[in-house]
A protein has these predicted regions:
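Extracellular jelly-roll beta-sandwich "head" domains, especially the C-terminal globular C1q domain
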Residues: 5-145
Length: 145
């Protein structure tokens, strides 16, 4: 943020995105490619490969949620950095509940430091995640500082 000599505040848009999966299911071992972008400031999230690329070094907040496919007993998803390491080793675990006949959903938030050029993606590590136009499976994030 800068202030001009005329007193105007110039605050460039911070990197931010909010994306969903509009159709299809994603099975274990695959990156979830969120193909619908409701917000993509700076176009740092790719709807073709499912990765967010940090444009600058800083602290980022990420959130993601998913609906488990009803045909799978357990589903797990994790946030990965640079195609390999899990961030904070946190995961979403979605289990069947005996009282419902449809998939279960859950969400989480993660804050982490990234360097410029680092990538972040959401990967299914067990089971199958459901995607639909209802936006049950989503991912988003933004630069905090």
């Amino acid at each position: 943020m800068t202030i001009s000599k005329e007193g105007y505040v110039n605050n460039p848009a911070r990197p931010a995105f909010d994306v969903t999966v509009s159709n299809g299911s994603v099975s274990s071992g695959n990156t979830i490619v969120f193909n619908e972008a409701d917000l993509n400031n700076g176009t740092h999230y790719s709807t073709s490969n499912g990765k967010f690329t940090a444009p600058i070094t800083g602290t980022y907040l990420f959130y993601f949620g998913a609906l488990k496919d009803a045909t799978t007993a357990v589903a797990r998803i994790k946030l990965l950095k640079n195609d390999g390491s899990y961030i904070h080793n946190r995961e979403l675990r979605l289990d069947n509940r005996p009282t419902i006949s449809y998939g279960e959903n859950a969400a989480t938030v993660i804050i982490c430091s990234l360097s410029s050029g680092n990538t972040v993606e959401v990967r299914v590590t067990e089971g199958t995640i459901y995607g639909s136009s209802d936006g049950y499976t989503y991912f988003g994030g933004y630069l905090l500082s």
